[in-house]
Amino acid sequence: MKVTILQFPGTNCEYDAQHAFKSLGAETEILWHKSDTIPSDTDLLIVAGGFSYGDYLRSGAIAKFSPVMKAVIKYADDGGKVLGICNGFQVLTESGLLPGALKRNESLHFLSKHHHLKVINNENIFLEKLDKGDIVNIPIAHHDGNYYIDDSGLKELYANNQVLLKYCDENGNDKNPNGSIDSIAGICNKERNVFGLMPHPERAMEAILGSDDGIKMLQGFLRA
C-alpha cells in the first residue's frame, strides 16, 4: 500500500503521519505542495496537520490555492481516498471536499491534550476496524477546531451517516472541548472516500506515549 502525504509551508505533522503508516507496513512518500500531480500509485492521500501558510487569513484558507490542491480535488472526485487530519481537515473544508467549516475554539485558547472520542459510524474504510460506540483516546492539538455547519447541513450529515466521531468522556458521555456543533470531531463526504477529523490518530500509535488507539483507526485503510 502506498500513502502519499502532502507538505505545505508550515505543515508539521507529515513525519508523524509517515511514521504511523510505516509502522503499519505501508510505503510512504511526502509530496511538496508545488506538485501538480498525485503519484499514480497512491492508495491513500494524507493532508497532514500543522499550520499551512502560518494559518494566515483562516486555517487552510491559503493552502487551498496551492498547485497540488487541484490534483487533490481531481483525485478525490475520481474516487481516491483522502484523509485530512487537523489542519488537513481545515484545508479539505476550505477546498469544498468536506462540508462545514472550522472556527476558533470556544475558549479562544490553543488546546493540546488527549481527549476521548466515540465512534458514531463505522460503515466506512476509515473506522471499519472499530465498532459503533467504541471509545478511543486520541490527542488533540488545535486553536481552530470548533466545527460548524448550518442546520440544513447538519441534518444532511446525519441523514447520510457522515458524522463519524464525537468528543466524549471516558464513559462515552458528551464532553466538548472546543464548542464544535453536536460535539462533532470527524466527518466524511457522501461518497465515503474523503475523511476529516481534528484529533491526531497518527500521534496515538504507541501506548508508551499515552495511547495506541490510533492503530485501529488507521488500519482500515490498509486494505485500500
Curated annotation (Swiss-Prot):
What is known about what this protein does? Part of the phosphoribosylformylglycinamidine synthase complex involved in the purines biosynthetic pathway. Catalyzes the ATP-dependent conversion of formylglycinamide ribonucleotide (FGAR) and glutamine to yield formylglycinamidine ribonucleotide (FGAM) and glutamate. The FGAM synthase complex is composed of three subunits. PurQ produces an ammonia molecule by converting glutamine to glutamate. PurL transfers the ammonia molecule to FGAR to form FGAM in an ATP-dependent manner.
Keywords carried by this UniProt record: ATP-binding, Cytoplasm, Glutamine amidotransferase, Hydrolase, Ligase, Nucleotide-binding, Purine biosynthesis
Q: Does the keyword rRNA-binding apply?
A: no
| Active-site residues annotated for this sequence | 86 (nucleophile), 200, 202
Glutamine amidotransferase type-1 domain: residues covered: 2-224
Under Enzyme Commission nomenclature, its number is 6.3.5.3, 3.5.1.2
Keyword Cytoplasm tagged? yes
Which HAMAP family does the entry link to?
Answer: PurQ (MF_00421)
Annotated protein name in UniProt:
Phosphoribosylformylglycinamidine synthase subunit PurQ
Molecular functions per Gene Ontology: ATP binding; glutaminase activity; phosphoribosylformylglycinamidine synthase activity
Task: Report which gene this protein is encoded by.
Answer: purQ
Cited Pfam families: GATase_5
Q: Which reaction does it catalyse?
A: N(2)-formyl-N(1)-(5-phospho-beta-D-ribosyl)glycinamide + L-glutamine + ATP + H2O = 2-formamido-N(1)-(5-O-phospho-beta-D-ribosyl)acetamidine + L-glutamate + ADP + phosphate + H(+); L-glutamine + H2O = L-glutamate + NH4(+)
Share what the entry says about its subunit structure, partners included. Part of the FGAM synthase complex composed of 1 PurL, 1 PurQ and 2 PurS subunits.
| Primary site of residence | cytoplasm
Q: Where in the cell is it found?
A: Cytoplasm
Q: Which GO terms describe its biological process?
A: 'de novo' IMP biosynthetic process
Pathway the protein takes part in: Purine metabolism; IMP biosynthesis via de novo pathway; 5-amino-1-(5-phospho-D-ribosyl)imidazole from N(2)-formyl-N(1)-(5-phospho-D-ribosyl)glycinamide: step 1/2
A single Gene Ontology CC term = cytoplasm
